[in-house]
Amino acid sequence: MKITIYFFLLLLSFTINSVSATVQKFNFFDLNKQLNIFLKKEYPLNEDSIKIIIHTPLKKNIYCRKPDFSILSNTHNLGLINILLTCSKQHYYLTVEVQSEGEYIVANRKIPRGTRIKESDLKILIGRLDVLPNNTYRKKKDVVNRISLREFFPLQPITSFMTRPFWLVKVNQQVTVIINGNNFKMSSKAKSLSNGAQNQNIRVKTNSGKIINGIINENGEVIVSP
């Protein structure tokens, strides 16, 4: 009888240990899985390939039924980021590396400062996005017709800090203002108070001294709607 009880207790202990190990392994695996899901929502890079590397080892005995993640930064840059993991009342600080590969825009040739950029000036490369400068352009259409603020060298990644819009309207320029009202349309001349690109809002001063706001159309006219 004692032998039977001994073997029963031994078997029960083995079963409990096995279940405990399985639960720990599952929870650790689930935590990594949940972190990947969270980061891929935070970095919606569409077709880009994303790889996540956790530099802070997670303890395998962490049990977290509903993990809550938050990025400890206002910017969503790629590369190394710090994440706060909250499990019930416990807090864990993680260092995570977000690597991504996708298309980005570089100069196809040497582009002088002040150039209105054409599509032929640009080239698409595929590579690591997390090692590029912040705000590197990803689409040609976002760069075409913009003005280079500095000289670009061949294969140099182009960022939003290196270009400005092409001004259809310049400060102090006489422009045509078109006012669209209910069942009427009228036009007059006014002086622009700033530079402006297509579809941008701009303030102009009429000949009577009144300051109004409007949207610049493709012809450089300022459209005022009620």
UniProtKB/Swiss-Prot annotation:
InterPro entries listed in its UniProt record: Flag_basal_body_FlgA_C, Flagellar_FlgA, SAF
Cellular component aspect of the GO annotation: periplasmic space
Keywords per UniProt: Bacterial flagellum biogenesis, Periplasm, Signal
Signal peptide from the UniProt entry: 1-21
Alphabetical list of Gene3D superfamilies matching this protein: 2.30.30.760, Antifreeze-like/N-acetylneuraminic acid synthase C-terminal domain (3.90.1210.10)
Main location, first listed in the record: periplasm
Domain of life the protein comes from: Bacteria
Subcellular location, record wording: Periplasm
GO biological process: bacterial-type flagellum assembly
Similarity-based family: Belongs to the FlgA family.
Task performed by this protein: Involved in the assembly process of the P-ring formation. It may associate with FlgF on the rod constituting a structure essential for the P-ring assembly or may act as a modulator protein for the P-ring assembly.
Name of the protein in question: Flagella basal body P-ring formation protein FlgA
Originating species: Buchnera aphidicola subsp. Acyrthosiphon pisum (strain APS)
Lineage: Bacteria, Pseudomonadati, Pseudomonadota, Gammaproteobacteria, Enterobacterales
Name of the coding gene: flgA
